[in-house]
From Swiss-Prot:
Repeat among keywords: no
Keywords attached to this entry: Ribonucleoprotein, Ribosomal protein, RNA-binding, rRNA-binding, tRNA-binding
This protein's name: Small ribosomal subunit protein uS13
UniProt entry tagged with the keyword tRNA processing: no
Length: 122
């Protein structure tokens, strides 16, 4: 198995698809990376040489924020919003949607399961 950015890349998949197993790399980014490395996107990971894997690793390490660094950066951005006390920060703090969705009904994913209120009947 090829190991790039601390992630074991599946050997039996095409390079373009296998790179998406890394957090922070989507199909579009994977296409750009393979083009920059000069590797055909249809090639299987098992057919890559060690030099090509090293080249992919270098491109990803130097040009992309991935895995733990990206997760940390996102968490710091959310924490900064919460510390500022802006509307988006308050919504994050309360666990509610922060992009304008309705919350009277729906928003169950963000709010979690319903909490029953004792003594309340229709």
């Amino acid at each position: 198995m090829a190991r790039i950015a601390g992630v074991n890349i599946p050997v039996n998949k095409r390079v373009e698809i296998a790179l998406t197993y890394i957090y922070g790399i989507c199909r579009d980014s994977a296409k750009r990376i393979t083009k920059e490395a000069g590797i055909e996107p249809q090639v299987r990971v098992s057919d890559l040489t060690d030099a090509e894997v090293a080249q992919l690793r270098d491109i990803i390490d130097n040009n992309h924020t991935v895995e733990g660094d990206l997760r940390r950066q996102i968490a710091m951005n959310v924490k900064r919003l919460m510390d500022l006390g802006c509307y988006r920060g308050l919504r994050h703090r309360r666990g509610l949607p922060c992009r304008g969705q309705r919350t009277h009904t729906n928003a169950r994913t963000r709010k979690g399961p319903r909490k029953p209120i004792a003594g309340k009947k229709k």
